[in-house]
Amino acid sequence: MTTSELIRKLCKEQNITIAELARRIGQTRQNLYKKLQRETLSIEEMKQIADALGVVFEQSFTLPDGNKYTIRNEGMTNEDNR
């Protein structure tokens, strides 16, 4: 599933249109549609979308030793996977 497919799925589950999501994050509907179509959302936009949808956005860095750092829209955590 692509990022844009997931965003559309979350919107559908919450009965939120892409136009409404765009309004919530301060973008035009046309601009958000283009970014979803091209898969060109920035990390900051992903955080804004997560906040607007009431979900957590996170990314992870896993070090060679198994130590994992997860960045969420509310901060960073360290998960020791050893």
Question: What residue spans do the PLM features occupy?
Answer:
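A short, Lys/Arg-rich alpha-helix, primarily the initiator
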Residues: 1-14, 20
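Alpha-helical residues within the helix-turn-helix
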Residues: 12, 23, 51
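Recognition helix of helix-turn-helix/homeodomain-like DNA-binding domains
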Residues: 26-41
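DNA major-groove recognition helix of helix-turn-helix/homeodomain DNA-binding modules
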Residues: 44-58
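Short, charged recognition helix plus adjacent turn
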Residues: 60-82
